[in-house]
Amino acid sequence: MPIIAVIDYDMGNLHSACKGLQEAGTQTIVSDRPEDLVSADAVVLPGVGAFDPAMQHLRSRQLIPVIQDILASGKPFLGICLGLQILFEGSEEGTEAGLGIIPGTVKRFQSEPGITIPHMGWNQLEYQQPDLPLWRHSPAQPWVYFVHSYYVDPVDPTVKAATVTHGTQTITAAIARDNLMAVQFHPEKSSTFGLQILANFVEQVQATLATPAV
């Protein structure tokens, strides 16, 4: 059974994500200790809240270089909500530098008639990487649950794995590149499809463990 480390940096309730991963057949460990993250088979970076405090909490725990090294190592990595946004270089929400893993910035939705900010509730995904393993056994345009006022804007459009449209604004809802996957929506709140995403991630971790190192 693979061990997945869920990074604890005081930015949200981690219980739901852990429960979903455990139901998918994995053991989870919630930790902010670098040695736990490095020794795990995969890492999940969840989070809700604001960009600057998130980066400050990671820095105070000396986790920024640890996360960067884990991503460079090829270990499966899943970011959720704020855990997607802080992978980028910075945010209009604050002044702190992000992790800088993905070139691009985090922007705020523009006000327009007929929409609410934050973007809150159920909305449909449009796949940009339809063959991504994270989407296995899933409908063509699944409904998922969002709660956010900011969205990621990657420089390289090929990292986009899915988009969503709020009013007239179509924004990035998920990214994927090599071992890194991250979603703006909350899988743990997205009913059957969300649990399937977590199960697919666990399946990828198991496949990685079964593949001999070159």
UniProtKB/Swiss-Prot annotation:
Presence of the UniProt keyword Membrane in the record: no
UniProt subcellular location: Cytoplasm
Active site: C81, H186, E188
Pathway: Amino-acid biosynthesis; L-histidine biosynthesis; L-histidine from 5-phospho-alpha-D-ribose 1-diphosphate: step 5/9
Keywords for this protein: Amino-acid biosynthesis, Cytoplasm, Glutamine amidotransferase, Histidine biosynthesis, Hydrolase, Lyase
A Pfam family per the record: GATase
Primary role: IGPS catalyzes the conversion of PRFAR and glutamine to IGP, AICAR and glutamate. The HisH subunit catalyzes the hydrolysis of glutamine to glutamate and ammonia as part of the synthesis of IGP and AICAR. The resulting ammonia molecule is channeled to the active site of HisF.
Subunit structure: Heterodimer of HisH and HisF.
Name of the molecule in the record: Imidazole glycerol phosphate synthase subunit HisH
Native source organism of the sequence: Acaryochloris marina (strain MBIC 11017)
